[in-house]
């Protein structure tokens, strides 16, 4: 799909190109109380009051997400107009903008339009510039066009005909908007990879498959890839990681991807993704109902791979290392048992009270491994706890950090990227719940504050660098009729890295 930019100040009568330029459809916004947006006012004048008459007749009330096509419109180059309800003008925020953009794309994709002019990016949204609107609109479009059909005997072809979108932006934002297109396409490609990996079944997306995916990313984008096998993991003394992997016939992999966009001496940001490609719970077996969704337990790994792919396509001037410990968590005669004690790469001994709290067991060794890069920051991403879902639901990812500055950067990025996160507590008092009579610490701290104690466990392995943890158990995938991986938190992570790179 082709995206382009055209500067236009509707308030100064600069809309001639849009009024005469050929297009299948122009998208206009209408607020409640019959208020026309700037672009809609110009088109209304060119069409001799058509938009006003439609609104006055009650055919378009401006309620958020409502759409109305006006066919065969005379006086402008576009053959039709799509009116999109924006809701109340004084409540028009980022969510309202995304709702409007999504509604517009859904309506357009159901038609045979090929070229569209999109004016909504210029709407005032929480002090964001129109280049922000361009990026958000492209991501909304790519979200609507994403389909996962490759596992069907007859994959479904794309049902839409849309090929070209022209965005009108404020003239001062033209240069930034062109950058926004590049970033949005790269980000959408990274999200698609993340979603594909999450949606693949566990018998396809194995640890070996993730390793091969990392190698392909490295080959396609000029990254350096290291994929360590069982013997190398054993040599590193990753006893905690291996305690999870031991009962599966699928060999574990320890994946490291290096992206160098800055000077070699510049400290990298390290992203660590939990890669449990299927989680039965091990000996602490999960209930059978809904266990199919445990293929999504590698979405942390998928988001890290999707992010570094997006970063490489954007060409960000920053160094990034992606680390993915990946294995299955299976029951078996040689599986780790509740009460077993294992030794982590750091040397801390861990009493495994519940084998279904396995994500932290593979992450802790990866977090120790990250020390060798002398990182500027380390962010781990994991579908870690059901407790986080209970606390935050499916809207916000849980953010935990021992570093206020890093947490602030991530929260700013989450707001900019429309990928919400909520900071959770990480007080020292919670550490007491991890005490063990027999080892240095236990892998669970009981039911109270389960998401917090999981993060506390990880914090024991992160003392040498700024660290944050994203619990995406509630945001990595959706159930029900819209079942599937979401691609989150790739937008948050990518925006954080864009900000760090100053781009």
UniProtKB/Swiss-Prot annotation:
Its cofactor is Mn(2+). Mn(2+) 1 binds at residues 279, 356, 358. Disulfide bonds: none annotated. Gene3D superfamilies: Leucine Aminopeptidase, subunit E, domain 1, Zn peptidases. It catalyses: Release of an N-terminal amino acid, Xaa-|-Yaa-, in which Xaa is preferably Leu, but may be other amino acids including Pro although not Arg or Lys, and Yaa may be Pro. Amino acid amides and methyl esters are also readily hydrolyzed, but rates on arylamides are exceedingly low; Release of an N-terminal amino acid, preferentially leucine, but not glutamic or aspartic acids. SUPFAM superfamilies: Macro domain-like, Zn-dependent exopeptidases. It comes from the Bacteria. Binds 2 manganese ions per subunit. GO terms for biological process: proteolysis. Keywords: Aminopeptidase, Cytoplasm, Hydrolase, Manganese, Metal-binding, Protease. Mn(2+) 2 binds at residues 274, 279, 297, 358. Transmembrane segments: none annotated. It is found in: Cytoplasm. CDD domains: Peptidase_M17 (cd00433). Its EC number is 3.4.11.1, 3.4.11.10. NCBIfam families: PRK00913.1-2 (NF002073), PRK00913.1-4 (NF002074), PRK00913.2-4 (NF002077). Belongs to the peptidase M17 family. Presumably involved in the processing and regular turnover of intracellular proteins. Catalyzes the removal of unsubstituted N-terminal amino acids from various peptides. This is Probable cytosol aminopeptidase. It comes from Burkholderia orbicola (strain MC0-3). The gene is pepA.
């Amino acid at each position: 799909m082709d995206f382009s930019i055209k500067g236009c100040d509707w308030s100064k009568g600069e809309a001639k190109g849009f009024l005469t330029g050929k297009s299948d459809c122009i998208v206009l916004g209408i607020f409640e109380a019959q208020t026309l947006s700037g672009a809609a006012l110009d088109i209304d004048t060119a069409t001799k009051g058509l938009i006003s008459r439609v609104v006055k007749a009650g055919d378009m009330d401006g309620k958020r997400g409502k759409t109305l096509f006006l066919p065969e419109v005379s006086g402008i180059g576009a053959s039709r107009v799509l009116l999109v309800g924006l809701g109340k003008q004084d409540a028009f925020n980022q969510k309202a903008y995304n709702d409007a953009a999504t509604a517009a794309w859904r309506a357009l994709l159901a038609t045979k339009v090929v070229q569209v002019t999109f004016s909504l990016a210029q709407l005032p949204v929480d002090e964001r510039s129109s280049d922000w609107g361009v990026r958000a609109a492209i991501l909304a479009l790519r979200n609507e066009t994403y389909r996962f059909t490759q596992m069907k005997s007859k994959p479904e072809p794309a049902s839409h005909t849309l090929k070209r979108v022209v965005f009108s932006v404020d003239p001062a934002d033209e240069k930034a908007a062109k950058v926004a297109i590049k970033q949005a396409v790269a980000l959408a490609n990274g999200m698609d990879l993340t979603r594909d990996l999450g949606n693949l079944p566990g018998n396809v997306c194995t640890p070996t498959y993730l390793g091969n995916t990392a190698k392909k990313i490295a080959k396609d984008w000029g990254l350096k890839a290291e994929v360590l096998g069982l013997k190398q993991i054993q040599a590193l003394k990753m006893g905690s990681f291996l305690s999870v992997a031991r009962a599966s016939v699928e060999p574990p992999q320890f994946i490291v991807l290096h992206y160098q966009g800055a000077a070699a001496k510049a400290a990298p940001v390290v992203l660590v993704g939990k890669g449990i490609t299927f989680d039965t719970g091990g000996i602490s077996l999960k209930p059978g109902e809904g266990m199919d969704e445990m293929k999504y337990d590698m979405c942390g790994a998928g988001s890290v791979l999707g992010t570094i792919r997006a970063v490489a396509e954007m060409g960000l001037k920053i160094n990034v290392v992606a680390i993915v410990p990946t294995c299955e968590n299976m029951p078996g005669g040689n599986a780790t048992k509740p009460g077993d004690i294992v030794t982590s790469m750091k040397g801390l001994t861990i009493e495994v009270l519940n084998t279904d709290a396995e994500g932290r067991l593979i992450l802790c060794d990866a977090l120790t491994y990250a020390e060798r890069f002398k990182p500027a920051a380390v962010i781990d991403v994991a579908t870690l706890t059901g407790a986080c879902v209970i606390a935050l639901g499916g809207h916000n990812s849980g953010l935990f950090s021992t570093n206020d500055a890093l947490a602030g950067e991530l929260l700013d990025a989450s707001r900019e990227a429309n990928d919400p996160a909520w900071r959770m507590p990480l007080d020292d008092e919670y550490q007491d719940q991890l005490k063990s009579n027999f080892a240095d610490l236990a892998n669970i701290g009981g039911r109270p504050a389960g998401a917090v104690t999981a993060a506390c466990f990880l914090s024991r392995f992160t003392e040498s660098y700024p660290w944050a943890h994203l619990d995406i158990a509630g945001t990595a995938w959706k159930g029900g009729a819209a079942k599937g991986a979401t691609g989150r938190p790739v937008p948050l992570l990518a925006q954080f890295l864009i900000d760090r790179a100053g781009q």
